[in-house]
Structures are given as C-alpha cells and as structure tokens.
C-alpha cells in the first residue's frame, strides 16, 4: 500500500495543494474524527436538529440539498453557522454529470448556489475532463475542493476498469482543485497524495436490499487505505440514538486509523 497512508493526517496536510484538503486533514486530527455523516433527510428543521447533535463528532457533514422539501437561504446560513460552531466542513453530494458549461451554472447559480456554501462537492467523469475544468472555474477562486467519483459502492456499478483509470489520470492534472475520490479503496501508483472518502460503511448490517453493500471502518481504513468513512442510516436510522451512534462510528473510525499508523 502507498506509504503515505501510514503518515498522520496532519503530516499529510502539508503535502496537499488544495486548501480545503489541508483544512480537512488538520481538522480531522484536531477533532480525532474521520467520520462523515450523510444527512439524507427532507425537512429543514430535522436536518438542522440532527446536525447540531452530531456536529461535535464529525469532520464532514454530507448533504443532498435537492431532496430538502422546504429549502431556503436561511437553512444554508444556519448550516454554515453550525459548521463554524462544531468545526466541520460541508460536502454537497451533488454528483455533477453534465458538460462543463452546464455544471458551471449548476454549481454557481440556480436555487441552491452550491459553490457559495459547500466546501466540497463531487462529480462523475463520464462527460470527460471538461466537467472538472468547468467546476474548477467556479470553485477554485472560492477556495473550494472537488472529489471525483472513481468507484461506487452499489452492486453492479459500471464505474470500474477504464472509467476508473481515466478518472485517476484527470485527477493528476487538476490537484489544485481536485483533492481526492469517493471510492471504496485507495488507488495505487498516483504521484499526488489525496483523500479517499468511502461510503457504504456499517457496523451492524451488510446490505439494504437496494444494492447498497456495507463494510466496516476497519475494512476500509486498515485494509483498503481509505481516509474518511461515510455513514448515513447507521447513525440516525429508525430506533437509533444519533449521538450514541455518531460517537460509536467516530471511535471505530479513529481506532482503525490508529491501527493503520501502528503498522508502519
């Protein structure tokens, strides 16, 4: 495995070109958290209430802003304020997938104005390298960062093989704006260091019947070299106490990171 993953997050921060990557790695070390929670709720009040509860235990809050039924600018302002209060970054999981000029408008404009408040967003690379360039023209001057979807955790995903290889190639050309990947593992042989965020993490279940396949924090961080675990329903699903579960996943993720460091 790439020797850089056996360095601490704070040591790796120094080698990152993107300012959000530097901030994120330093924040993770400071909070002792490599947990990102995917807040896929549809009501503004429920989202803000949950984020305020779990904010102290996460490094990143991941949103799907287009599923919020009562979205408004006040929600954005309150979410940003909670990020400052609890010291986490906001990742809008937009998965852009259009040509460069269109994604520029989707990122900067429209109802959501994503670039104005989300530190991090992501994209598919199906349209070609132009999608990265388009998003970069908006996000780089604002000090934002982009994750590329090199793989997906759902069963039967087509994001494999040559698709993944081309994505890695384009990443290397844009490390001022791109700082990592949404993927289930760390990729070998990349010249630049980067952050890997892995979805599909669960401590209690192995799947959801809709194609989602779950793995443990230890599997993805120790065995696969990932850096951040993304957990959703495992934290706030029916019958769960979000604070208790956020603490549990944070501890499991951090323990796995410490185990990885001890191997070198």
UniProtKB/Swiss-Prot annotation:
Pathway: Pyrimidine metabolism; UMP biosynthesis via de novo pathway; UMP from orotate: step 2/2
Binding annotation for substrate: 40, 62-64, 93-102, 214, 233
One Gene Ontology molecular-function label: orotidine-5'-phosphate decarboxylase activity
SUPFAM superfamilies: Ribulose-phoshate binding barrel
Recorded GO CC terms: cytosol; nucleus; protein aggregate center
Keyword Electron transport attached: no
Annotated SMART domains: OMPdecase
Pfam families, A to Z: OMPdecase
Annotated keywords: Decarboxylase, Lyase, Pyrimidine biosynthesis
Signal peptide positions (record): none
UniProt GO BP: 'de novo' pyrimidine nucleobase biosynthetic process; 'de novo' UMP biosynthetic process
InterPro entries: Aldolase_TIM (IPR013785), OMPdecase (IPR014732), OMPdecase_AS (IPR018089), OMPdeCOase_dom (IPR001754), RibuloseP-bd_barrel (IPR011060)
Active site: 95 (proton donor)
UniProt keyword Lyase present: yes
The EC number(s) this enzyme carries: 4.1.1.23
Catalytic reaction equation(s): orotidine 5'-phosphate + H(+) = UMP + CO2
Disulfide bonds: none
Group of enzyme by EC: lyase
Stated family: Belongs to the OMP decarboxylase family.
NCBIfam families to which the protein is assigned, alphabetical: pyrF (TIGR01740)
Protein name: Orotidine 5'-phosphate decarboxylase
Organism: Schizosaccharomyces pombe (strain 972 / ATCC 24843) (Fission yeast)
